[in-house]
Amino acid sequence: MLKLLLGDPNTRKLKRYQPIVEEINFLEEEISQLTDDELRKETQNLKSNISAELDFKKQKELLEEFLPKAFAIVREASKRVLDMRHFDVQLIGGMVLNECQIAEMKTGEGKTLVATLPCYLNALTGKGVHVVTVNDYLARRDAEWMGQVHRFLGLSVGLIQQDMNPVERKKNYDCDITYATNSELGFDYLRDNMATDISEVVQRKFNYCVIDEVDSILIDEARTPLIISGQVERPQEKYQKAAELSLALIKAKELSKDGIDPEGDYEVDEKQRSCILTDQGFAKCEEYLGVNDLYNPQDPWAHYITNALKAKELFIKDVNYIIKNEEAVIVDEFTGRVMPGRRWSDGQHQAIEAKESLKIQPETQTLASITYQNFFLLYPGLAGMTGTAKTEEVEFEKTYKLESTVIPTNQIRKRQDWSDQVFKTEIGKWKAVAKETAKIHRDGRPVLVGTTSVEKSELLSSLLSAEKIPHNLLNAKPENVEREAEIVAQAGRAGAVTIATNMAGRGTDIILGGNSDYMARLKLKEILIPLLVKPDNEHKPPIPKQRNSKSKGGFSRKAGSNLKKKISNSSTNLFPCKLDEVIEKKLSLLSDELVKNWGDKQLSVLELDDRIATAAEKAPTDDKLIRLLRESLSDVKNEYEKVLIHEEEKVREAGGLHVIGTERHESRRVDNQLRGRAGRQGDLGSTRFFLSLDDNLLRIFGGDRVANLMNAFRVDEDMPIESGMLTRSLESAQKKVETYYYDIRKQVFEYDEVMNNQRKAVYGERLRVLKGIDLKRQVIGYGERTMIEIVDAYINPDLPPEEWNIEQLISKVKEFIYLLDDLKVEDINLLSIEELKNYLQEQLRIAYDLKESQIDKIRPGLMREAERFFILQQIDNLWREHLQSMDSLRESVGLRGYGQKDPLIEYKNEGYDMFLEMMTNMRRNVIYSMFMFQPKTDKNDKN
């Protein structure tokens, strides 16, 4: 009723932006008259005006005032550099982001281009802007691609990548706009708060941040906190023994009901992702291990056995992890990418290593941790973009205080979503997928098949190979990851078949007919790698042979002499045509020139990538070689374009890209993301999901209704089932999962919120110390607090002064401050409590000055260094112990629900008391260490 009376709130919101859009359009003509240098000058003028204003509120008002002009400048720069003009709806998207909201824009509507608008505007403050993407590949692509606009306008652009050292990181964070992944930002924040010297801190104070694929980062990844850990020694043979034992245990066929154990040694709850031993299982384990109690604190076994069972039942090779270089490497469940260097905690990773007979790495202990929710709430300005935010609108609002606004599409969507096909068994489903893929491929349309795991993508690959359908495979396996740019470049060509694991997180548009820009880059890379790249980098040839009925994909490790041969084999698959002789000759001359100037095989693959990417930009350059490279790229691109333009027409006539989903994801949003790959910007396209009653979603969350359906359908495995009841079961299963995971995230957030206030206090204190601000006053402050605490502990104000325990008080004071050795009972006997506190504080200050003069005789400034060292040492050690105590408290506090107490309130109260105790210990330890500090002096040592 309200909606009818007031109209749609989203439409009302969009109307508000219309006058500003008109103002930007009005400015367009005026701005287009400016030369490139004048545009850059405008940027400098805006920057000096805005960054000069120090008051936060007034600066915000200035940004609002200059918004139309700034957006018009970016639009003009983008036209000149990228040949892309922001549509009116994209300008609205930019304004929504500038107001720290979430802009929901459909796939292919140019989210990446929209981000340039608010990033440019907020970078004018000089405080830095972060653009966050889900993976290194996208961060790099956006920094190279959209970064051109900012660089053209005279702003500096930084990029954070996984393998950068701290010096490179600092340089990149100091830029006006920095592109990075969510995990790199989070880990750098934690590392900065473990730094022992201010020079090790790489990040600046946070200012404004735009998150691309915001739902993926703030929702999907919010269940797992970021953790930095250190190694602790644990007996490794226990992992091996538990892994052997897990193989001897028998899984129960069903879960326990009404407290009655099922038949079997352990039950597996896939919904909760847990394994629980039955009474029979406990007895079997105790007998096998020769122990009386698996929970004996002196010789605990339960934890090892549970982890071994989880490794056996819930962590599956080529789904949750892959084996690479004799190590178990985690595969990100949302993006399908490997995460080298990441490990599961609580001994789970060690259990997997034992299961796979790999070398068991030492277990780890948490040194620092934060959830993505609390990390991103540290930004004063936070905005995000996604194709699908409405499904999670409530969560964005509640957790992050972020509104969502749906931005209308620029052109009407022409995509057709065909009805789901459900099969009784999984093998029936895969056969149907292969059949439909083959049919669409023969119609000359490109096909993208989304799978949920490495294992499933390889199963489909073998089915297509049997049908002799050439295809490309994009999953977490290293040999496929290295080909990502190449695979995506040709995914839109006529009849191309691409199998991708969780394409949803890949954020790369598939251009119908193929991407001539990427192909030109790859062609140059193919020619230059053998000449310019160091041989040890050659194990990554850029263009391995495309899969067909004979090849199993991948490539051999022996590169070198085979490299050119391999590349020439594959060229026919990748490139649309042979280059004419004039261009070939030009490329040959270019190669000679580059070898002469850049050296024979002197570059790494990344360095060559960087130079080719710079050449592909339109930003002005003084480098003669980059200009030559740019010319050649343009020639090759134009040559390919001639062929691809016909191919694009053919693909459009055939019906555009067809997307096949092979399993419903736990979240409807991820399904919509996959669908959104087809039909971008008004293109034709179609999608279909193939499902089976064995799929995880239906099996785990579908309940008994689906199990009964399975028995009711007496149909062949390759016969699709269509039923309204089944569709409803699917919908309700997805809603169930979404609610279930929302509750988990809410709980993670609520508990981390308690830690968050403590973390802010500790990290704030640490930063002050690192900067060396008033260290002496800080330590004396610790001492004064300690004196007050000693007086309060030993003197009861309700007793008369003659009954006060003055002697014990004095011995406690001397314990902390040995320089007060001559303090006597008669000195303080007649003082009131308040006078006593003041007297002891005064004595402490005198003693501290005395200590400082002793230390500074050895070396001036040594006292300040000692203060910093001891405060940091105590904060770090005690914080680490505190994190473990809080973990233990969190595990135990859940049981208090049985006693009618709210576990969260109990956790808050006890956590607060533990924190106060930690801070008290820190102050006391620092003051004690400072007075006990006796540096060794060596007469021969000038240092």
Curated annotation (Swiss-Prot):
- Specify the protein's topology with respect to the membrane: Peripheral membrane protein
rRNA-binding as UniProt keyword: no
Q: Reaction(s) catalyzed by this protein?
A: ATP + H2O + cellular proteinSide 1 = ADP + phosphate + cellular proteinSide 2
Q: What is its main location?
A: membrane
Give GO cellular component annotations, separated by semicolons.
Answer: cell envelope Sec protein transport complex; cytosol; plasma membrane-derived thylakoid membrane
Q: Name one GO biological process term.
A: protein transport by the Sec complex
Q: Which residues form the signal peptide?
A: none
Which EC numbers characterise this protein's activity in its record? Answer: 7.4.2.8
Q: How does it assemble?
A: Monomer and homodimer. Part of the essential Sec protein translocation apparatus which comprises SecA, SecYEG and auxiliary proteins SecDF. Other proteins may also be involved.
Summarizing the function annotation, the protein's role is:
Part of the Sec protein translocase complex. Interacts with the SecYEG preprotein conducting channel. Has a central role in coupling the hydrolysis of ATP to the transfer of proteins into and across the cell membrane, serving as an ATP-driven molecular motor driving the stepwise translocation of polypeptide chains across the membrane.
Please report the name of this protein according to its UniProt entry.
Protein translocase subunit SecA
Q: What is the lineage of its organism?
A: Bacteria, Bacillati, Cyanobacteriota, Cyanophyceae, Synechococcales
